[in-house]
């Protein structure tokens, strides 16, 4: 089971100067996946419980297959294209994604990836040079799996390290749709 939180961050709505499109049910969503734990454990964590009170938790959400990467691929395109591994893939640019739908409607989007070493990083993984810990992995970054994002610099620039979240919040630049991925240590294990 994939455990995740979706937050309707209406409190942030008034502080963003990024392009804004009024939503029917909510104006902003932040999706945070905690894939390697049971829902009850994640919901019982005091920090996550506090965060869940700020928005909504989707409790009937399940993986489409195993291992990880096909689920991340499906999260923004609705299909996993028969992927049954976590190896490096590049899904062709003719495949439509949520990014296309959001941009067609003028809705801002972005990803924040914990321990991703730089904006638009496309490598398979990033290990902490001090500890050797495998912190960031591409298989958990849905947008860069698609050539329609990875091959376009303006789109690739919207995939950022999580450290950029605070700066974007401070400068009123948070997008309306956000996908936030914890690193391999913090993903709910």
Model regions and ranges:
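N-terminal pro-sequences and low-complexity stem/linker regions of secreted or lumenal proteins
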Residues: 18-189
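Fungal secretory targeting signals
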Residues: 1-18
């Amino acid at each position: 089971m994939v455990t995740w939180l979706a937050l309707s961050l209406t409190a942030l709505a008034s502080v963003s100067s990024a392009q804004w499109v009024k939503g029917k049910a909510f104006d902003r969503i932040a999706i945070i996946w905690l894939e390697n734990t049971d829902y009850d454990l994640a919901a019982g964590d005091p920090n996550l419980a506090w965060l869940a009170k700020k928005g909504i938790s989707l409790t009937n959400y399940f993986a489409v297959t195993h291992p990880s990467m096909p689920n991340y691929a499906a999260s923004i395109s609705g299909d996993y294209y028969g992927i049954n591994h976590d190896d490096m893939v590049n899904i062709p640019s003719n495949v439509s994604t949520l990014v296309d739908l959001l941009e067609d409607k003028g809705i801002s989007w972005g990803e924040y990836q914990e321990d991703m070493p730089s904006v638009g990083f496309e490598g398979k993984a990033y290990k902490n040079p001090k500890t050797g810990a495998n912190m960031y992995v591409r298989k958990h970054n849905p947008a860069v799996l698609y050539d329609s994002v990875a091959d376009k610099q303006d789109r690739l620039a919207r995939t950022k390290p999580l450290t950029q979240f605070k700066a974007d919040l401070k400068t009123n630049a948070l997008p309306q749709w956000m996908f936030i991925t914890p690193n391999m240590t913090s993903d709910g294990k």
